[in-house]
Structure formats: structure tokens, C-alpha cells
Regions:
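Conserved acetyl-CoA-binding loop-helix of GNAT-fold acetyltransferases
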Residues: 130-134, 433, 441-457
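Walker A/P-loop nucleotide-binding motif
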Residues: 117-130
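N-terminal pre-P-loop "Q-motif" helix
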Residues: 88-116, 612
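Conserved beta-hairpin
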Residues: 127, 364-383, 389-391
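Terminal substrate-recognition subdomain of acyl/acetyltransferases
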Residues: 9, 14-77, 175-198, 203-206, ...
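Conserved Walker A/P-loop ATP-binding site and its immediately adjacent core
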Residues: 151-169
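Walker A/P-loop NTP-binding motif
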Residues: 129-145
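Pre-Walker A (Motif I) flank of P-loop NTPase domains
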Residues: 111-120, 149-150, 366
Length: 679
């Protein structure tokens, strides 16, 4: 590469740096730490040669040492290979040959109730995706001969992640003399078809949970897929290939390596074949450029090693809240930086080089950490300053639909709730990423970190703190709600990768400035959700809905609301609840009104249903799920659910309509039922 001298380079904005500018900061505020790190790492690399191209002056001589020419190993194809020799001849390394051999096991369908999984792991540049593509071609060829029609599926974060895999599927099929038809999504191949006999399709991760009839499934970069989706795929398919990168931004996060892989190994009904590809395709093992790349971009960053002494410090709450000097932290404190970023690499976050660049260079981004008293970082947090927007920009958002770059919470609050004053507040902090050391989960460290951040925010006069826009699940949502963060926005569509809805939360720090606004936004959010549960959120998990509908400190949506029921509706409700001749289907209108009353007045009344009772009325009444589906989601028998719902409705009738015993008109109904039964 030919960069300008560092003294000039740090005065220029790259395209990436231009893309991270926000209204509150101009070009002069952009930091250039990533360039400086890149330059310093290059100058400190033994085998790097640097020349001033203007003067032909050698700026840095390489230290070559005893350099041996690299010769790729000779490839030996197994004599008794079951895949076609034409496939094996496309392999570039012996490692790839052995990986192909490992995947031959997938040719046989496992016995009923059993599963066969192949797990391939590798660093970047080992040809992992390529060899899986060739294996799929070979498997499709063999299975077609056995069963005539083959349906294989490939899933990953997005179609671009499987472009190499699909490229080698095509190469493999052509080597086996097939003519292929391709379908594209943009420039990416998403489907490979051979006549009416072979179908190999890209399918989004969450959609795999409703797929049927796939002979073999490939999960590429499995560490980037949420664990619930991985468990769902495992439960649904008997032959699966999981591929994951060891180091790198797609890195095998601990969720995959410690939890999911452990689960596979311990499952008695699953045979697991593991293989690690170590041999690079284009260069020698231990190549210095690869080492430099990993080091510079923190691809191999790992969190601190945790010892028994560290657990003692945690038990004694021996913590330090770290407010680093960003220049010193990013450019001179290598050990702390690697610990900090290593937590992200090993956590559930999906990292790209741009994430490191944003953290280092974006003028509105900053970091905080929680360390033990011995200096080991145990919680990493990246934050962004938001708010303080001028009237002109706010007007463009309101009138012209302008999207405020780098100001997610103000943008959504203006667009969805019309609260323009919120964007003018002196400022807020949005937590972009918060992650706890993977070995120290569920020890209260995340909550401790939030408390420290909130203390600092109060001292600095910050108006609010926003929670990240994350894929909502019950455990994560409970963490934020337990710490006082209120939902203020939710996406109307599930994330195609995780299958989760993205939620934004906020917590007022300065009650006078942000408190009323955030409480109002939360009430509007709850009202929107309550009235959308038969629409875009009809399949949201009931426990998640229940938490999102939480009333905040006695902040009911409509405390004076009374159920709008006619006398006839009341009679049907009572007949249904007390076991009279009335079904749920004949009483849905009245039951729905009663349940809506509960949530509109929630926080103002003394009635508080048990949590599971709330999930019952959410799932069956507000989301209007069929009996069979509702029973499955709630983990009940259909008959049990039907009886339980009657009891819940009876409780609501007793509170809101003041029926405390069987009504007079029901007595005659009950008597007539008994007479009919006696006949």
C-alpha cells in the first residue's frame, strides 16, 4: 500500500471517517487513532519494508532472518475415498482433503432419533467455506443417486457470507458434469439447482426454524448465529455441518465454543465429528503478514485469564470504574486494549473492522470499563453521545423524513412520538455495546457497570441514558428492565438472523429534563404494542410481551378506563367463566375488552395477575393464537389451557364487574344443564 506520510495522513479523512460524522461534530473532531495504530504496527513489524516513494529513501529495513522458501505440501487423495476423485482434486491443501473425508459420514442418514453433526473450525484463509461447498456438491451427487431428489440448505448471517461456499458448490457440480441454474440476490448466489433433482438454497437463520425436508444443512460462521437459533436447527435436522472461525471478526464466540459445542458433545443422540483446518491456502503456516493483520486489527484479542484470586475480588466487590484517556488507551496501553476488545470478540457481539474504527475514530463515541483491583478488565462498554440537535435539523426530520446520523434515540422519539424537545436536550448517552467477561456471567457485573455509568452521567449533567437497540429476548430484556430502563421503540419486523425484535430503551437521569418525555414515550410505546399484538407482533414471545407492557412506577395507560361491555356481553362472559353453555369463541369480543381493561389500568388497580396468567391472556386473547399453537407456546395441554383461561377471566370479572359468586341468572342455566345430563 502507498499511504501518505503519517503527519499528512492524520489530516485527511477517509471515506469511512466521512461516514461516521454526526451533526454535533465536524471533520476536525474526528480522531485518527486507527491510522496511527496501523502505522505504528507496520513500523514495528520485523519483516516490513517501508520506502518513501517521493525520495526513494528507505524508511525502514526489514529484519528477514533465516527465511526459507515456502513449498505447499503434496496432496494425497485417500485410496478408499467415497466422494468422487474429481472433487478431491479441487482441494488445495491436505487439510482440505481431510476435511472432505470427515464430511463423507453425512452420506448415510442416521438411525431414527439420532443425529450426525460435523464441526469445522479454522482461522481465516484456510479454505473452510470452499471445502464445504465442494462437499455439498459431492453429497448432492451421491444422494441424488440414492433418492432421486436432494434438498440441501445453507444458512449464515446474510447471502454475502456464503458467496465463496456457493461458488465452490458450482465448481464441484460442474466437475461432476452437471449443468447448473443459479438464482441471485443482488450479486450473491442464493440458489443452485440441477434440473428437478438437486436444490441447494441459502435460507436466513431464523427461517430455518420453519424449514422442512432438508437432507443436509450447513450453518456457516455458526458463532455469529444466536444460540436459540442454533439449538432450533439442531433439534430440527439430523445431518448438519457447523463451520466457525477461531479468530477473526466472525470469531468463535464463547456462546458457540463453550455452550453449543459442549451441548453437542454431551448429547447422547448426536455423533459429532470435529476437524480443525490449520494449513493456509495462499501462504505458509506462521506467515508474518497474517500475524501482523491479526495483531493490528485485534482479530485474536482475548479477555484476561480469570483465576481463583479474581473470583475472590469479585466476591469482595473489588472493582474500579475506568474512564480511560482515549489516546493513551488506544495507542499505548496494548494489554488493556486487547482485554477490552477481547471481551467483545468472545461475547455474542458480531464485530467487523469498521466497529474497531468507529470506536477509535468517531468523535461522539467513547468507552468505559469495569476492572478488578488487579487491573483485569471484566466489563467493556462502548457509548455514543446523542442529542443537542438544532431546530433546523429537527424540522428536516419532522417534515422531510431526514434520518439523524448517529442519533438513534432522538431520531426515533421524534418520528414515532413527535417529541421534538427530546432531541434538543443537552445530551444523552446511548450504550452501543455492553459485554461482560464470558467466564463471569450472571454475577451482577453488568448491573454494577450500569450503576457506575449512571453515577458519572449525573455528575456530568447528562439527561438520559439509552439502552442499545438489541434483539429482544426475555433474559436480556429482564436485565435492562430490572435496572430501570423503559422500552420506547420496537421494530415491527423480526431480525432475519436472530428472529428477535429490536428494542430501544431509555432511562431518565435528569428527571426535570428527560423524565416526563421518556415516561410519555414509554406509555405511547405500550399503547402501540397493546393494539398491535394481533398484527405485526402476533408471534412475539408472551413473556417478552408481558415485560414490555410493564407499568412504570404506577404509570397506567388509562387509569379511569372502564370495560365497555353491554349487558349481553356481560351475560356471555359470566356464562363462559362459570362453566355455562358458552365457548371462548362465542365470547372473544367481551374477553378481549376485559383483558384490554386490565392492561390499560395496570398500575392503578389492586389486582395483579400471576405472571403466567398474564402470559396466558397475552398468548390466547391479545395475540389471538389458535388453541393448539397457544398451548404449545405456553407448554400446556390444550384442555388445561382452556380451563385455566376460564379461571383467569373469572378473576377479571370478579374485579371489574364485581361478580363474586355465581349470578342469579346462571343458577337456572346450571339447573337446566343438570336436568339435561340426568336424562
Amino acid at each position: 500500500m502507498i499511504p501518505p506520510p503519517l503527519s499528512e495522513w492524520v489530516k485527511q479523512l477517509t471515506k469511512f471517517q466521512q461516514s461516521i460524522l454526526v451533526p454535533q461534530y465536524g471533520p476536525d473532531h474526528v480522531r485518527h487513532f486507527l491510522k496511527v495504530r496501523f502505522w505504528n504496527k507496520l513500523m514495528n513489524m520485523n519483516k516490513a519494508l517501508a520506502i518513501n516513494v517521493d525520495s526513494d529513501e528507505v524508511v525502514k529495513e526489514p529484519v528477514l532472518g533465516n527465511v526459507q522458501p515456502w513449498k505447499p505440501k503434496e496432496i494425497v487423495i485417500p485410496e478408499k475415498a467415497r466422494f468422487s476423485r474429481a472433487i478431491y482434486e479441487l482441494a488445495k491443501t491436505q487439510d482440505q482433503v481431510e476435511a472432505l473425508r470427515a464430511m463423507e459420514v453425512l452420506m448415510e442418514r442416521p438411525p431414527r432419533g439420532k443425529k450426525v453433526n460435523v464441526v469445522l473450525i479454522a482461522d481465516r484463509g484456510r479454505g473452510k467455506s470452499a471445502i464445504i461447498g465442494l462437499a455439498l456438491a459431492a453429497l448432492a451427487h451421491r444422494l441424488r443417486k440414492v433418492k432421486g431428489r436432494v434438498r440441501l440448505a445453507v444458512t449464515a448471517m446474510n447471502p454475502s457470507n456464503v458467496s465463496t461456499l456457493m461458488e465452490f458448490v458450482v465448481k464441484g457440480l460442474k466437475a461432476l458434469n452437471y449443468d447448473v441454474d443459479l438464482s441471485y440476490w443482488g450479486s450473491d448466489v442464493v440458489s443452485v439447482k440441477v434440473g428437478v433433482s438437486i436444490f441447494i438454497d441459502y435460507i436466513r437463520p431464523y427461517d430455518m426454524l420453519s424449514e422442512e425436508g432438508r437432507d443436509i444443512v450447513v450453518v456457516d460462521e455458526a458463532a455469529m448465529i444466536p444460540l436459540p437459533v442454533l439449538y432450533g436447527i439442531h433439534g430440527r435436522f439430523s445431518r448438519v455441518i457447523y463451520a466457525s472461525t477461531i479468530h477473526g471478526y466472525e470469531g468463535a464466540g464463547r456462546g458457540f465454543s463453550l455452550r453449543f459445542l459442549k451441548f453437542l458433545r454431551e448429547d447422547r443422540d448426536t455423533r459429532v465429528i470435529e476437524y480443525e483446518l490449520k494449513e493456509p491456502i495462499r501462504y505458509a503456516l506462521g506467515d508474518p503478514v497474517e500475524h501482523w493483520l491479526f495483531d493490528t486489527l485485534l482479530l485474536d484479542a482475548e479477555p484476561a485469564k480469570i483465576t481463583n484470586e479474581d473470583y475472590d475480588l469479585i466476591n469482595k466487590r473489588g472493582f474500579n470504574y475506568v474512564i480511560p484517556d482515549l489516546k493513551e488507551f488506544f495507542l499505548t496501553n496494548e494489554d488493556q486494549l486487547r482485554q477490552f476488545f477481547g471481551i467483545y470478540v468472545q461475547a455474542h457481539y458480531r464485530n467487523e473492522p469498521d466497529d474497531l474504527g468507529m470506536m477509535m475514530d468517531a468523535p461522539h463515541h467513547f468507552i468505559r470499563a469495569l476492572s478488578l483491583n488487579n487491573g483485569k478488565i471484566v466489563v467493556s462498554v462502548e457509548l455514543a453521545e446523542e442529542g443537542g440537535i438544532n431546530d433546523e435539523l429537527i424540522d428536516l426530520v419532522v417534515r422531510g423524513g431526514l434520518k439523524l446520523p448517529g442519533n438513534i434515540l432522538p431520531d426515533r422519539i421524534i418520528k414515532y412520538w413527535g417529541l421534538t424537545e427530546f432531541a434538543k436536550l443537552r445530551g444523552g448517552w446511548r450504550i452501543i455495546r455492553i459485554a461482560t467477561h464470558p467466564e463471569l456471567q450472571d454475577k451482577g457485573l453488568g448491573t454494577e457497570m450500569l450503576r457506575k455509568i449512571e453515577e458519572e452521567a449525573r455528575e456530568r449533567g447528562i439527561d438520559w441514558i439509552g439502552g442499545v437497540g438489541f434483539g429482544v429476548n426475555a433474559k436480556l430484556l429482564n436485565f435492562w428492565i430490572r435496572n430501570g430502563y423503559m422500552p420506547v421503540h420496537i421494530s415491527p419486523e423480526r431480525n432475519p438472523i436472530s428472529g428477535e425484535y429490536s428494542v430501544l430503551l431509555a432511562k431518565p437521569i435528569n428527571e426535570a429534563a428527560g423524565g416526563d418525555t421518556i415516561i410519555y414515550a414509554n406509555k405511547e410505546f405500550r399503547l402501540r404494542l397493546l393494539n398491535s399484538l394481533q398484527g405485526p407482533f402476533h408471534d412475539m414471545e408472551p413473556d417478552v410481551v408481558r415485560m414490555l407492557l410493564t407499568d412504570w412506577g404506577g404509570q397506567p395507560l388509562d387509569p379511569s378506563y372502564s370495560p365497555r361491555l353491554t349487558d349481553a356481553q356481560v351475560r356471555r362472559l359470566v356464562a363462559y367463566s362459570w362453566g355455562g353453555p358458552m365457548t371462548y369463541e362465542n365470547t372473544t369480543d367481551a374477553i378481549t375488552e376485559l383483558v384490554r381493561t386490565y392492561y390499560l389500568r395496570k398500575g392503578a388497580d389492586s389486582i395483579e395477575l400471576p405472571l403466567f396468567y398474564e402470559e396466558v391472556i397475552i398468548c390466547k386473547v391479545l395475540q389471538a393464537r389458535p388453541w393448539k399453537e397457544a398451548a404449545r407456546v405456553l407448554g400446556l395441554r390444550k384442555s388445561t389451557l382452556m380451563l385455566l383461561l376460564r379461571e383467569v377471566v373469572k378473576l377479571l370479572i370478579q374485579y371489574y364487574i364485581k361478580y363474586t359468586e355465581i349470578p342469579e341468572f346462571m343458577i337456572s342455566v346450571t339447573k337446566s344443564q343438570r336436568k339435561g345430563q340426568s336424562r
